[in-house]
């Protein structure tokens, strides 16, 4: 699936089928956000105990019921592996999976920089496209920046990562 932004600020998705035929469709950005969040929230490959974890940090959001524990394994300044345990809403689970995809394999310094960019984005601080690119799919979480009830869900695991990477 290719995603391209057109002049009307809608996204144009180009679906390729197995027979190489292409079908184009215009969709609103909210539809793409919803589908991306659902896809990330359903992923399970990062949800497991992490043997040899060098850090563990629990995050709890009583307003939504999210209770997620982030586990990290660092070695020689590299984030070697990250996983999580617990349960949360679709937003917190998707956000956690995005975070793990983002920081796994990076140096601690690179991961800290991504966290800084993320928190600036969520606070509505202006940032360059280049800065935001380091967030990958996590950029869509900016959608929740102005939703007081959901921003806690979107940032929960990122706060845990911030503690673990200090």
Where are these regions (language model features)?
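Active-site- and interface-proximal helix/loop "cap" or "latch" segments in soluble metabolic
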Residues: 73, 84-143
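Secondary-structure capping and boundary motifs in well-ordered enzyme cores
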Residues: 64, 91, 146-150
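C-terminal binding/interaction regions
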Residues: 26-46, 116-166
């Amino acid at each position: 699936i290719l995603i391209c932004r057109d002049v009307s600020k809608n996204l144009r998705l180009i679906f390729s089928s197995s027979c190489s035929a292409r079908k184009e469709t215009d969709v609103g950005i909210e539809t793409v956000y919803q589908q991306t969040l659902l896809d990330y929230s359903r992923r399970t490959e990062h949800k497991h105990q992490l043997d040899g974890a060098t850090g563990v940090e629990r995050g709890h959001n009583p307003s939504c019921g999210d209770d997620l524990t982030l586990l990290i394994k660092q070695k020689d300044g590299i984030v070697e592996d990250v996983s999580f345990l617990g349960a949360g809403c679709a937003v917190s689970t998707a956000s956690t999976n995005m975070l793990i995809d983002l920081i796994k394999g990076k140096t601690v310094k690179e991961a800290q920089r991504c966290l800084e960019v993320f928190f600036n984005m969520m606070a509505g601080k202006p940032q360059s496209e280049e800065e935001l690119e380091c967030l990958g799919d996590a950029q869509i979480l900016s959608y929740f920046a102005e939703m007081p009830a959901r921003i806690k869900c979107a940032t929960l695991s990122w706060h845990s990562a911030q503690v673990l990477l200090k």
